[in-house]
């Protein structure tokens, strides 16, 4: 038992034999369409929950629960949780798995059969009244970044996340300016908070085994929901959409200078106001520098 295991929660986690039996009983096969690679190692899911710091007081969102390996490890802490699963047969089977392997957790669990890219506070009201909630997930590799940015945009109270993603994606999400892999995901995520890679996961803990290694990314949101640099003196906030538009344009032509990449939307006066050299490339700018450029752009157009 780890420190995250709630002493009042009875049950056990899924091993390889359990996963294969559940899949066979339900007629489920992992599909590339939904990026399904099911975790078959109890030690790995407990490690994820431990890194996430989940406790019995938490309300947890899981995206892509699959057959329930990580789900059971989260419930083992005593936490309350909602799982969003896109695949109907998998979503239908999940409550049965919880009832079989951890029956006393049934009342703390709900599954929603929906594409995570379509969720919002209206169609997923479970978290509406929470001051803050956490995301813990083994995300489908092909849509991991869009899911994270979509959830952060739509749920102001998504305070932290611990996700397992493809190692290459994890490196991009947590990278700093100046690197070849620093890009749109890195800088947009930095608008909301800080991210770091906190571990690497081998391929042999999955069924089927993926062709790439995985890694864990831990994210903590800024108290105000965005980088403090976006706060204006009058209490307003620099427009996020303007900042993201500049990011998209700068990285859309990342080998060009800022002057060349942004010439259609940023006049030279804005670079001057922001104190940013237009001969630099977008890949060298921090999120706070993109914010400064967006603020300067607003000031130029307002004058």
From Swiss-Prot:
SUPFAM superfamilies noted in UniProt: S-adenosyl-L-methionine-dependent methyltransferases
Subcellular location: Cytoplasm
Function noted in UniProt: Specifically dimethylates two adjacent adenosines (A1518 and A1519) in the loop of a conserved hairpin near the 3'-end of 16S rRNA in the 30S particle. May play a critical role in biogenesis of 30S subunits.
The protein, known as: Ribosomal RNA small subunit methyltransferase A
CC annotations in GO: cytosol
Family: Belongs to the class I-like SAM-binding methyltransferase superfamily. rRNA adenine N(6)-methyltransferase family. RsmA subfamily.
CDD domains: AdoMet_MTases
NCBIfam families for this protein: ksgA
Organism field: Bifidobacterium adolescentis (strain ATCC 15703 / DSM 20083 / NCTC 11814 / E194a)
Stored PANTHER family: DIMETHYLADENOSINE TRANSFERASE, DIMETHYLADENOSINE TRANSFERASE-RELATED
EC number: 2.1.1.182
Source superkingdom: Bacteria
Keywords tagged on the record: Cytoplasm, Methyltransferase, RNA-binding, rRNA processing, S-adenosyl-L-methionine, Transferase
Positions with a binding annotation for S-adenosyl-L-methionine: 37, 39, 64, 85, 115, 138
Gene Ontology molecular function: 16S rRNA (adenine(1518)-N(6)/adenine(1519)-N(6))-dimethyltransferase activity; RNA binding
HAMAP family, per database record: 16SrRNA_methyltr_A
Reactions mediated catalytically: adenosine(1518)/adenosine(1519) in 16S rRNA + 4 S-adenosyl-L-methionine = N(6)-dimethyladenosine(1518)/N(6)-dimethyladenosine(1519) in 16S rRNA + 4 S-adenosyl-L-homocysteine + 4 H(+)
